[in-house]
Design a protein with these regions (language model features):
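Extracellular, repeat-based ectodomains that mediate carbohydrate processing or recognition
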Residues: 1-107
Length: 107
């Protein structure tokens, strides 16, 4: 496993607040997730980095208020799971990213 030589800034504190980061490695790709807070709303962000390049970055949550996301790389798939509050209920959701495609949000 390579040692990371330099710190990298992944979010812009003037644009959004970020907490509860997660990281998973798959080959040379680095997958990240974090809880983003913008305009009084928490959402789940996911990102793929290759070296200094941002391959993609997007919101992957289901519209509710997100809490404590986790991430796992296994068998060529990247799995994200999180708690989400919507319509006066908490639920646990999951979503898979594999071969450049996103699966549906699972409950």
């Amino acid at each position: 496993m390579e040692q990371i030589q330099n710190n990298r800034v992944m979010t812009d504190l003037y644009r959004e607040n970020a907490q509860f980061p997660g990281i998973a490695l798959d080959g040379s790709d680095v997958y990240l997730c974090w809880q983003r807070f913008v305009d009084r709303h928490d959402s789940l962000m996911a990102s793929c980095r290759r070296g200094d390049e941002v391959v993609w970055e997007r919101e992957i949550s289901d519209g509710g208020e997100v809490l404590h996301p986790v991430i796992l790389a296994h068998g060529g798939a990247i799995w994200y799971a999180w708690s989400e509050y919507a319509r006066e209920n908490w639920r646990i959701l999951a979503r898979c990213y594999r071969d450049g495609q996103w699966g549906e949000v699972l409950t």
